[in-house]
């Protein structure tokens, strides 16, 4: 699958855009996930500030704190086919904080978070240990495919 079969609507909804990964980076990271699919894939990637992420986490998950990534799968109406998988929302401040706290290169952690969020759109989860182990293994494999050596484990809020 070529990268042009993965379409990303990149929304930059944060005040400070300096140092963010560019569209091409997100495109390559997401394309690595979907390289086994032989169909067109579309998703929205929205980068937000901590205030918006806090609100989204509270509104949708009833958690009164911000988080690093949220995923919102799209389910088309019955009988309708759509290449749209859903939305991945990433919090700039939390991802940058985690990167520094864990001493992980910024690009590596951004790649990890978009991969993590995209896997949620495909139905992967980490609610129970068995699912978490599988999801982390898939994340590591994709990160290696993207040229990153390790995958840090990030506590999910």
Swiss-Prot record:
InterPro entries linked to this entry: MetalPrtase_cat_dom_sf_prd, YbeY, YbeY_CS
Molecular function per GO: metalloendopeptidase activity; RNA endonuclease activity; zinc ion binding
Positions with a binding annotation for Zn(2+): 116, 120, 126
Necessary cofactors: Zn(2+)
Chief place of localization: cytoplasm
Cofactor note: Binds 1 zinc ion.
PROSITE patterns: UPF0054
Matches recorded under PANTHER family: ENDORIBONUCLEASE YBEY, CHLOROPLASTIC
NCBIfam families assigned: rRNA maturation RNase YbeY
Role played: Single strand-specific metallo-endoribonuclease involved in late-stage 70S ribosome quality control and in maturation of the 3' terminus of the 16S rRNA.
Descriptive protein name: Endoribonuclease YbeY
Species in which this protein is naturally found: Blochmanniella pennsylvanica (strain BPEN)
